[in-house]
Curated annotation (Swiss-Prot):
Disulphide bridges, residue numbers: C35-C45, C98-C110, C178-C184, C255-C268, C258-C265, C470-C500, C764-C790, C766-C809
Transmembrane regions: 818-838
Membrane topology of the entry: Single-pass type I membrane protein
Keyword hit for Transmembrane: yes
Biological role: Key component of innate and adaptive immunity. TLRs (Toll-like receptors) control host immune response against pathogens through recognition of molecular patterns specific to microorganisms. TLR9 is a nucleotide-sensing TLR which is activated by unmethylated cytidine-phosphate-guanosine (CpG) dinucleotides. Acts via MYD88 and TRAF6, leading to NF-kappa-B activation, cytokine secretion and the inflammatory response. Upon CpG stimulation, induces B-cell proliferation, activation, survival and antibody production.
Keyword tRNA-binding appears in the UniProt entry: no
LRR repeat ranges, renumbered to this chain: 62-85, 87-110, 122-147, 150-166, 167-190, 198-221, 223-242, 243-268, 283-306, 308-332, 333-356, 363-386, 390-413, 415-440, 470-494, 496-519, 520-543, 545-572, 574-598, 600-622, 627-650, 652-675, 676-699, 701-723, 724-747, 749-772
Name of the protein in question: Toll-like receptor 9
Annotated gene: TLR9
Domain of life: Eukaryota
Cytoplasmic compartment residues: 839-1031
A GO CC term attached to the entry: endolysosome
InterPro entries: Leu-rich_rpt (IPR001611), Leu-rich_rpt_typical-subtyp (IPR003591), LRR_12 (IPR041283), LRR_dom_sf (IPR032675), TIR_dom (IPR000157), Toll_tir_struct_dom_sf (IPR035897)
């Protein structure tokens, strides 16, 4: 089958379209091309750059489609008939198809057109998302609608007519229609009572709309009202009248604190916001209240007096740094479970210590307290004294407070505390006694540098699938990203029930010897990653008898020190250790020759230098063999170029998962997998494998998952996977495969659950066999309709393999050949008789003229290896001669001969500047077939003419080629003896300019002949045979 060339002929396109329709009708192709049918009746058409809604085949189970996602396409026009065929459609996502110009990445203007009955034709529709589309009015909507999103559009007016008839609507989102990213000429206008007809509306979000007041006439059924980041700076009871069913109210960001803003901010007017004391007095069912970023300096207790059911209160990003030490506002909030006071700092000030107000002690249901970003330097028992007797308190967030002295033992007095976050502070060690009593630095303030004080990024998570988290443990303390240099046992006094300790990203550089964590007898997870630990002592961490997970990754500095040894024998002395990470330490030499443990089940050894360790003979050959219970082993990024069978033979036989990602393996001995009899998952992604041709997966292997993605595999041997009968998941994505053959799998193909072939340059030739095979196993191929793409031919590159049905498409090369042959036959059949009848004699004459011309042209092409036909030499000092050369000779020979034009070399035009005169002259003589001397007279020749003539004579002597052609403009002038002799021997190489105009035509014909033919043919055979080449 030939490759595709050029554009498809319209007839071919028509035939292929018909073939595709037939295939779809037969149900052989994926039913919802170009989209993908996913679970629960969802048809996913995201990111396909569609310009219209796809109309699926009648043979597709359109009645089973309940959700259609058209997110991030280019659909600018919605027709009445677009969704008629989807009779069971309940959810429709049209987000990001025609965004407003200000929200578009390229700021292109766009306008979406929606015809009147587009959505009315879908009476079952319940959820509709039209966010991020440039629409200015609410389209006609079916009464069945339950959820409607019109956020980030250009809708600026809401009146009763817009939403009439939507009696089932419960969720309405109209966020961001008028703010700095989506500017507008006016704020969103909600007419009084515009939403009153929505009797079942429970969720209303109007954030980022430049509203200056709460819309009037809201439906009393509202339970969630979100009005944050508008310009509502006054709230009174009448603003929320009749909203007695409210459960969540968000009015934060309406009067902002701009020194902590991360986006354009308008300063809150002085004396605002103004919240009437009874604003929330009638909201008895309120469970969540957001007053964040509202420039509050004080809390009025009357605000919360009637909120007995309040569970969540967000007061972050205000100015409550003094209020929280003396307020009584929390005394009536017995049901409050979460309180956020983050970033209530004094601008440019850090307090020496902080004492929470006694009213915190009345929050008997409090479970989580966020207090990061308040900026106090000392954490002592008096700081949290008000919280000690809260029986439900589980989570305490104190990160990013610039704390440099912390009495960690105070957390032992909190019986229900499960998580304490002290990360991103400046804690450097155990708190001194004076500081712990709170006697020093009382009330002192330290000025801080100005700047953004946003919360820093979270730490890097542990290795996925290897290190467990701490969410299920009873007590976790996070001290990551502090200034700890050493660990002292006194730091953890009274913390014996601590089960998870996070110390990553400090500067701990001490040699751990088994005494640092002695009080932590219940510790199960210890994270010491991103430090500088010295593992010299053999009893490191042995004081932790219950330790199950230990993360020592990214402690590479000690291992990079030349000549320093490292002792890993402590692993054998941790009886409960199940997870260990030594990743990214660049371990390569002077370490224990063998790791031993009877309990370890997962080891992350990625990012080291096993290639250097295993290059030391048998010194580290048995490095992992002593891990008798090891199930998972990660050897990624170890710079491995080869993996010998004896190396695999010395890995633990209990292994079930082996990762070898991102090494340099160009060869793998597949038969050696029998040496790991329990191996179920093998990850070889990101290596340099180019072919799977050396043998096959061995018979009897337990392998279930094989990842070969991101290699350079272009060939797979027949039956390579066939013997691995337990294989269920195979990843061949991002390779160089041009086809996928069923012969690779044998009977295994029908049992595969995952076969990933995305990112391969598949060759989409007509009749490609891989299409039939992928259709047979399409349930196992992720992204088959839209993400399995062609790599060739060029016109299909980057397109889905179903852009045309490769099983029924026409052979492109054969199509063009047949088309060309038929066209030629018809043309000749019509043209030959007609031309013979009309101009037979003329054609006969032209035919013989061409026969006479072709041999001459052939000879000329054979000899024409030089860039110029003639080098024109004349005396520039004679203006008449120069004028004749430029305006007569050049025009006649170069411009008026058509396709027989000659290439002349002229001194003024073709000589290269920067070269000497002789270099240019030499190049011109030897780059031209002939030398044309234009002379007014022949008796006195000097200068350039003489030098050129001597070079021509030299060429005659050296190359035996006579290249001289003379043109004499004054025939009556005295002729030299050389000219007369040349006229006698080679008359056609001496041409005289005729005085009569009638003879000029003959002159130009003779000159053309003289310049295009060899002078050998012009010599008079009676006198001379001309120059001959010596044999």
């Amino acid at each position: 089958m030939g490759p595709c060339h050029g554009a498809l002929h319209p007839l071919s396109l028509l035939v292929q379209a018909a073939a595709l329709a037939v295939a779809l009708a037969q149900g052989t192709l994926p039913a919802f091309l170009p989209c993908e049918l996913q679970r629960h009746g969802l048809v996913n058409c995201d990111w396909l750059f569609l310009k219209s809604v796809p109309h699926f085949s009648a043979a597709a189970p359109r009645g089973n489609v309940t959700s259609l996602s058209l997110y991030s396409n280019r659909i600018h026009h919605l027709h009445d008939s677009d969704f008629v065929h989807l009779s069971s459609l309940r959810r429709l996502n049209l987000k990001w198809n025609c965004p407003p110009a200000s929200l578009s990445p390229m700021h292109f203007p766009c306008h979406m057109t929606i015809e009147p009955h587009t959505f009315l034709a879908v009476p079952t529709l319940e959820e509709l998302n039209l966010s991020y589309n440039s629409i200015t009015t609410v389209p006609a909507l079916p009464s069945s609608l339950v959820s409607l999103s019109l956020s980030r559009t250009n809708i600026l007016v809401l009146d009763p007519a817009n939403l009439a008839g939507l009696h089932s609507l419960r969720f309405l989102f109209l966020d961001g229609n008028c703010y700095y990213k989506n500017p507008c000429p006016q704020a969103l206008q909600v007419a009084p009572g515009a939403l009153l007809g929505l009797g079942n509306l429970t969720h209303l979000s109007l954030k980022y709309n430049n509203l200056t007041a709460v819309p009037r006439g809201l439906p009393p059924s509202l339970e969630y009202l979100l009005l944050s980041y508008n310009h509502i700076i006054t709230l009174a009871p009448e603003d929320l009248a009749n909203l007695t069913a409210l459960r969540v109210l968000d009015v934060g960001g309406n009067c902002r604190r701009c020194d902590h803003a991360r986006n354009p901010c308008m300063e809150c007017p002085k004396g605002f916001p103004h919240l009437h004391p009874d604003t929330f007095s009638h909201l008895n069912h309120l469970e969540g209240l957001v007053l964040k970023d509202s420039s509050l300096y004080n809390l009025n207790p009357r605000w919360f007096h009637a909120l007995g059911n309040l569970m969540v209160l967000d007061l972050s990003e205000n100015f409550l740094y003094d209020c929280i030490t003396k307020t009584t506002a929390f005394q009536g909030l017995a049901q409050l479970r979460r309180l956020n006071l983050s970033f209530n700092y004094h601008k440019k000030v850090s307090f020496a210590h902080l004492h929470l107000a006694p009213s915190f002690g009345s929050l008997l249901s409090l479970q989580q307290l966020d207090m990061h970003g308040i900026f106090f330097r000392s954490l002592s028992e008096t700081t949290l004294r008000s919280l000690v007797h809260l029986p439900m308190l589980q989570s305490l967030h104190l990160q990013m407070n610039f704390i440099n002295q912390a009495q960690l033992s105070i957390f032992g007095a909190f019986p229900g505390l499960r998580y304490v976050d002290l990360s991103d502070n400046r804690i450097s060690g155990a708190m001194e006694l004076a500081a712990a009593t709170g006697e020093v630095d009382g009330g002192e303030r330290v000025r801080l540098p100005s700047g953004d004080l946003a919360l820093g990024p979270p730490g890097t998570p542990s290795s996925e699938g290897f290190m467990p988290g701490c969410k299920t443990l009873n007590f976790t303390l996070d001290l990551s990203r502090n200034n700890l240099v050493t660990i002292q046992p006194e730091m953890f006094a009274r913390l014996s029930r601590l089960q998870c300790l996070l110390l990553s990203r400090n500067s701990i550089s001490q040699a751990v010897n088994g005494s640092q964590f002695m009080p932590l007898t219940s510790l199960q997870v210890l994270d010491l990653s991103h430090n500088k630990l010295d593992l010299y002592h053999g009893r490191s961490f042995t004081e932790l008898p219950r330790l199950e997970a230990l993360d020592l990754s990214y402690n590479s500095q000690p291992f990079s020190m030349q000549g320093v040894g490292h002792n890993l024998s402590f692993v054998a002395q941790l009886p409960a250790l199940r997870y260990l990470s030594l990743a990214h330490n660049d371990i390569h030499s002077r370490v224990s020759q063998q790791l031993c443990s009877a309990s370890l089940r997962a080891l992350d050894f990625s990012g080291n230098a096993l290639s250097r360790m295993w290059a030391e003979g048998d010194l580290y050959l048995h490095f992992f063999r002593g891990l008798r219970s090891l199930v998972r082993l990660d050897l990624s990024q170890n710079r491995l170029h080869t993996l010998l069978p004896r190396t695999l033979d010395n890995l633990p036989k209990s292994l079930r998962l082996l990762r070898l990602r991102d090494n340099y393996l160009a060869f793998f001995n597949w038969s050696s997998l029998v040496l790991l009899p329990r191996l179920e998952a093998l990850d070889l992604a990101g290596n340099q494998l180019k072919a799977l041709s050396n043998g096959s997966l061995p018979n009897g292997t337990q392998l279930q998952r094989l990842d070969l993605s991101s290699n350079s595999i272009s060939f797979v041997a027949s039956s390579f996977f066939a013997l691995a009968t337990r294989l269920r998941e195979l990843n061949l994505s991002a390779n160089a495969l041009k086809t996928v053959e069923p012969s690779w799998f044998g009977s295994l193909a029908g049992t595969l659950k995952v076969l990933d072939v995305t990112g391969n340059p598949l060759h989409c030739a007509c009749g490609a066999a891989f299409v039939d095979f992928l259709l047979e196993v399409q349930a196992a191929v992720p992204g088959l309709p839209g993400h399995v793409k062609c790599g060739s031919p060029g016109q299909l590159q980057g397109r889905s393999i179903f852009a045309q049905d490769l099983r029924l498409c026409l052979d492109e090369a054969l199509s063009w050949d047949c088309f060309g042959l038929s066209l030629l036959t018809v043309a000749l059949g019509l043209a030959v008789p007609m031309l013979h009848h009309l101009c037979g004699w003329d054609l006969w004459y032209c035919f013989h003229l061409c026969l006479a011309w072709l041999p001459r042209r052939g000879r000329r092409r054979g000899a024409d290896a030089l860039p110029y036909d003639a080098f024109v030499v004349f005396d520039k000092a004679q203006s008449a001669v120069a004028d004749w050369v430029y305006n007569e000779l050049r025009v006649r020979l170069e411009e008026r001969r058509g396709r027989r034009a000659l290439r002349l070399c002229l001194e003024e035009r073709d000589w290269l500047p920067g070269k000497t005169l002789f270099e240019n002259l030499w190049a011109s003589v030897y780059s031209s077939r002939k030398m044309l001397f234009v002379l007014a007279h022949t008796d006195r020749v000097s200068g350039l003419l003489r030098a050129s003539f001597l070079l021509a004579q030299q060429r005659l002597l050296e190359d035996r080629k006579d290249v001289v052609v003379l043109v004499i403009l004054r025939p009556d002038a005295h002729r030299s003896r050389y000219v007369r002799l040349r006229q006698r021997l080679c008359r056609q190489s001496v041409l005289l300019w005729p005085h009569q105009p009638s003879g000029q035509r003959s002159f130009w014909a003779q000159l053309g002949t003289a310049l295009t033919r060899d002078n050998q043919h012009f010599y008079n055979q009676n006198f001379c045979r001309g120059p001959t080449t010596a044999e």
